[in-house]
């Protein structure tokens, strides 16, 4: 993404016409993308290979950590980052339609902003004007054990950003957009989890996504060995997995982290992942409480 690029009415219309923000699974096109032609983000951008056979476009370290938390969720069937919100009221084919109890009518951000008495942002250039298109950082589809589906919308912010009144107003519009569709909306900040947990998530991502799926037999064996990991170092744990699964250390890393991601090896993610640090094993409930999305924790307090 280039710092010199700017959002313009023409650019927004071009994105809409090209199909950005549409599609499912491997065919989804994010609204904002990490490309040389896109305006730059304020954070450090990331392109990550995921389970959906495409690259995911993440615009900050916080979004990368949120993405890691999201990919751990049981039943995750689709993940769409940089998901655009409709500006106009319409009959929708939006991801949230499956959650609607009644008519699939989507109220656009222009109507919602007016109802809330808030100014809707716009983009101007040379006398041309276009309503700004809001986007939600992550929109998750979950298949539940009961056979139903759930949609979770996640917005990622730094806590310092919430000191600005205009930021809160824009978030209020985004929250209301999803609330009117019956969708759970989570505001995720770094204060909802420790820095060490975030570091563990980012360390584990490289071994869980874009890597070959570990054999089910190896994952099951790792889960069976998990109680013995308590008090051991990462190096000791990897050696044990290597020996019992008869694999390389690289393969042992993938087996270990993929087992953690499934919740079958419930480690304390706040413990350092350096080779000399020791692990603490947790109950399944305590393990999932470390994940703010799984726990449905939100920084929104208004």
Predicted regions and their residues:
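Electrostatic, structured charged patches in enzyme active sites and in nucleic-acid/phosphate-binding
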Residues: 1-302
